[in-house]
């Protein structure tokens, strides 16, 4: 079977020139070898095949090469058409235009096609030209005669030469497809390269070459197999030799192990003998220890450590003969060395235990807080001393260490003069106390810092054994703290300063409560003694503060009654009112602590009530009924609310009751105003106090929204509303007083015939006399805004009635002049009112 012809395809150089494309693979139009322009097909459609003479839709010949595209077959119905086209092409090849370059390239393929067409059923037909054209498209028309008979130019000759080189080159195809018609918009130059005979020859040559290669590979594999067998044999012999050698060396190895064990035993024995001899050789270190350290404490400590190890070893090996003499010498050296080291240790302790003012200590670091006052190299030296003392079983240094460090803390704290705190506390007026200014607060904080320094130092030097040492070191300083705190808690203030004496104690209570966790960490929770003492002091502070919260305003009144007698006529703001406002202005700063105290007091009351025995006898019932009033009064004074807002509400309500009670008792009716009840002074007194309290509550932070939660704001607003209501009621009472005075001028018009002129004149005289008497009373109203408001309302009431009275006199033609004194105007009455409100 003959092989199909091989194809060679290249783009036309002439078409490349016409399209001005930069590369030979540009998708521009191409010409065939006859110079025919390509037919452009639809984009994406498969182009038909066309030979160099214009044959369209030629059947394809299956190719044996992988690079050759497979063209579609055509049925036998196209045989006549193909024969006609072949005949036409033969006729044209004999025409005068056969000088074209494509004539020679198309003759041989078609002759070959004619010979093989009937035998191979037209399946060996190959397309000579490929166009991007739909197979159903009409055949491209033949080129004109002018193209065939035109005289070739030099460029045409170059193009023909290039095409000939392409035709003579090795087979290749520009566009490659696996199946189907070639899809391209360009024409392809194609030619027959070789015949079937040459291709069969090439296949036979290739087959012979493959056979030779297979034979060579087979020979190489046989050689490798032979070499592998030889290598296996050599390795087996080598393994046998190694096994025999191992058997021969085994006895020698066993003998060497025995000799090695003997050598190790001898060497170990020699080392032990040498070590024992070193223990007994006292002369080596005798001179070093007896001569002293001379500043070289490192080598001196090593020598003394060697002495200690020798003593321990000889003490354990009591079977040594004549060891007593050596033991005595070693003990003597140990005592000498310890004396030397102890002296050095004491001097080093003095260096790190110099007294300091605690207030000058810088801020402590987060770890190793002792570095704030002790140099690191001193700590390292002391650590080495302590480590050697422990190895030598020498514990006498601990007493020296505890004494020095204990005195350091105690004397440093005494520099703050805690003994003066009691005097300072008793002399200081609590009314002027500033939060955080109590000297005991600073003292407690500095005590804690020294505890923390000592805690870190003891932990660094003694490890897990620090606790017992630390307890003894801080014990004197802790006793001083308790001795300083107790009298301050129990100090009794002057009677008038009782209310405000709670603020320094609340400040101390805050301080101790906040610092207690730090004290527990510094002292250690295992130290139950010192921690329990601190908790006891906090409990005393809590009880004292809670007792100071339970006060009665009536008691305060009795305490200052002697002073109040002198100012019995004073209707300005009461001292108790001013004190209560100032009290709560400062107490709000301790809101959290106050609530803790109130809740603690409530728990104590509930516990005491639950523990109290219940009496069932008739005698107890009778005694309780006889003293019911006194017990209820005492219970009401001791039971405190559990919240700050409840405590505030209770005290301010008691303040209202106190002011109302004092208004009734301390301001009797004055002769000038005996016509009016209640006494006008008591009304002015309540107006001044209610206005002062309500204004202060608004302006201060006592009832601020930031101080209370949402559920407490309603109670706070209710308190303020209650004082404002009391103020409005008293102002109404005062206005009714002015209306009573104005009613003096009222004349009954229905009985005007009976009223004589003297009666009207008498009303006017009584009215003026009342004003003159009021000038002696002097309404003291310190607040200028309140005074102006009350004065304006009084002028409106009096002025309106006086104007009506004057109008009545004018209409009745009543003349009130006396001794030619003119009738008083409304401005004159207003000036008299101004004098009434002016304070002395």
From Swiss-Prot:
Main location: cytoplasm
GO annotation, cellular component aspect: cytosol; exocyst; Flemming body; plasma membrane
Membrane topology: Peripheral membrane protein
Keyword Coiled coil: yes
UniProt keywords, alphabetically: Cell membrane, Coiled coil, Cytoplasm, Exocytosis, Membrane, Protein transport, Transport
Residue spans of biased composition, Low complexity class: 50-73, 83-111, 603-637
Matching Gene3D superfamilies: Exocyst complex component Exo70
Disordered: annotated span: 1-112, 601-638
InterPro entries for this protein: Cullin_repeat-like_dom_sf, Exo70, Exo70_C
Biased composition (Polar residues): 19-31
Single GO biological process annotation from the record: protein transport
Compartments, as annotated in UniProt: Cytoplasm, Cytosol; Cell membrane; Midbody, Midbody ring
Residue runs in coiled coils: 193-227
Stated role: Component of the exocyst complex involved in the docking of exocytic vesicles with fusion sites on the plasma membrane.
Family: Belongs to the EXO70 family.
Complex formation: The exocyst complex is composed of sec3/exoc1, sec5/exoc2, sec6/exoc3, sec8/exoc4, sec10/exoc5, sec15/exoc6, exo70/exoc7 and exo84/exoc8.
Full protein name: Exocyst complex component 7
Species: Dictyostelium discoideum (Social amoeba)
């Amino acid at each position: 079977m003959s092989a199909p012809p091989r194809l060679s395809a290249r783009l036309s150089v002439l078409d490349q020139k016409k399209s001005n494309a930069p590369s030979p693979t540009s998708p521009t139009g191409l010409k065939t070898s006859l110079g025919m322009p390509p037919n452009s097909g639809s984009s994406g459609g498969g182009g038909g095949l066309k030979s160099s003479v214009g044959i369209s839709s030629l059947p394809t010949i299956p190719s044996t090469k992988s690079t050759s595209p497979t063209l579609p077959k055509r049925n036998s119905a196209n045989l006549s058409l193909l024969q006609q086209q072949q005949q036409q092409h033969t006729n044209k090849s004999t025409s005068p235009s056969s000088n074209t370059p494509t004539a020679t390239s198309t003759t041989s393929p078609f002759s070959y096609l004619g010979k093989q067409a009937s035998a191979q059923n037209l399946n060996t037909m190959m397309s000579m030209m490929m166009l991007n054209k739909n197979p159903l498209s009409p055949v491209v028309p033949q080129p004109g005669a002018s193209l065939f008979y035109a005289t070739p130019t030099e460029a045409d000759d170059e193009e023909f030469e290039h095409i000939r080189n392409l035709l003579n080159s090795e087979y290749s195809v520009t566009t490659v497809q696996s199946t189907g018609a070639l899809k391209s918009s360009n024409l392809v130059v194609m030619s027959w390269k070789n015949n079937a005979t040459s291709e069969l020859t090439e296949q036979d040559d290739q087959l012979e070459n493959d056979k030779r290669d297979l034979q060579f590979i087979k020979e190489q594999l046989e050689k490798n197999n032979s070499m592998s067998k030889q290598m296996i044999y050599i390795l087996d012999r080598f393994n046998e030799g190694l096994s025999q050698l191992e058997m021969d060396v085994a006895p020698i190895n066993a003998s060497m192990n025995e000799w090695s064990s003997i050598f190790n035993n001898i060497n170990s024995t020699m080392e032990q003998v040498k070590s024992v001899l070193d223990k007994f050789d006292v002369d080596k270190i005798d001179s070093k220890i007896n001569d002293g350290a001379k500043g070289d404490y490192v080598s001196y400590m090593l020598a003394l450590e060697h002495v200690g190890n020798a003593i321990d070893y000889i003490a354990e090996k009591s079977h040594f003969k004549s060891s007593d003499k050596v033991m005595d010498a070693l003990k003597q050296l140990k005592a000498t060395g310890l004396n030397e080291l102890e002296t050095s240790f004491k001097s080093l302790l003095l260096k790190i235990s110099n007294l300091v003012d605690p207030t000058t200590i810088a801020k402590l670091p987060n770890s190793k807080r002792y570095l704030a006052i002790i140099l690191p190299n001193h700590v390292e030296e002391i650590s080495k001393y302590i480590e050697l003392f422990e190895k030598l079983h020498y514990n006498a240094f601990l007493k020296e260490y505890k004494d020095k460090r204990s005195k350091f803390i105690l004397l440093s704290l005494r520099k703050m003069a805690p003994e003066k705190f009691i005097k300072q506390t008793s002399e200081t007026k609590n009314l002027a106390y500033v939060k955080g200014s109590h000297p005991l607060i600073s003292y407690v904080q500095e005590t804690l810092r020294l505890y923390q320094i000592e805690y870190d130092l003891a932990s660094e030097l003694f490890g897990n054994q620090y606790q017992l040492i630390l307890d003894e070191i801080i014990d004197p300083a802790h006793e001083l703290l308790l001795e300083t705190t107790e009298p301050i808690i129990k100090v009794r203030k002057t009677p008038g300063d009782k209310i405000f004496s709670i603020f320094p104690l609340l400040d101390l209570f805050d301080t101790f409560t906040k610092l207690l966790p730090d004290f527990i960490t510094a002292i250690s929770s295992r130290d139950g003694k010192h921690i329990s003492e601190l908790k006891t002091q906090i409990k005393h502070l809590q009880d004292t503060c809670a007792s100071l919260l339970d006060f009665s305003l009536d008691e305060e009144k009795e305490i200052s009654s002697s002073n109040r007698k002198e100012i019995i006529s004073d209707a300005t703001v009461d001292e108790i009112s001013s004190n209560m406002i100032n009290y709560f202005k400062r107490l709000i700063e301790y809101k959290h602590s106050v609530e803790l105290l109130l809740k603690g007091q409530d728990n104590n009351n509930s516990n005491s009530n639950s523990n109290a025995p219940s009496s069932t006898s008739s005698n107890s019932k009778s005694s309780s009924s006889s003293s019911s009033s006194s017990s209820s009064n005492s219970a009401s004074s001791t039971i405190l609310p559990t919240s700050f807002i409840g405590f505030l509400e209770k005290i301010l309500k008691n303040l209202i009751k106190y002011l109302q009670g004092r208004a009734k008792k301390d301001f009797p009716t004055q002769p000038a105003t005996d016509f009016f009840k209640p006494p006008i002074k008591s009304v002015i007194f309540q107006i001044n106090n209610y206005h002062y309290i309500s204004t202060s509550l608004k302006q201060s932070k006592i009832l601020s929204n930031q101080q209370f939660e949402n559920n407490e704001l309603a109670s706070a607003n209710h308190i303020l509303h209650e004082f404002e209501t009391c103020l409005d009621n008293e102002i109404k009472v005062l206005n009714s007083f002015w209306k009573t005075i104005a009613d003096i001028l009222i004349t009954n018009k229905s009985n005007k015939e009976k009223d004589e002129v003297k009666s009207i004149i008498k009303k006017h005289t009584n009215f003026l006399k009342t004003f003159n008497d009021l000038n002696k009373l002097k309404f003291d109203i310190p607040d200028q805004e309140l005074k102006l408001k009350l004065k304006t309302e009084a002028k409106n009431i009096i002025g309106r009635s006086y104007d009506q009275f004057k109008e009545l006199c004018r209409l009745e033609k009543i003349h009130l002049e006396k001794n030619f004194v003119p009738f008083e105007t409304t401005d004159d009455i207003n000036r008299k009112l101004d004098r009434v409100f002016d304070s002395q």
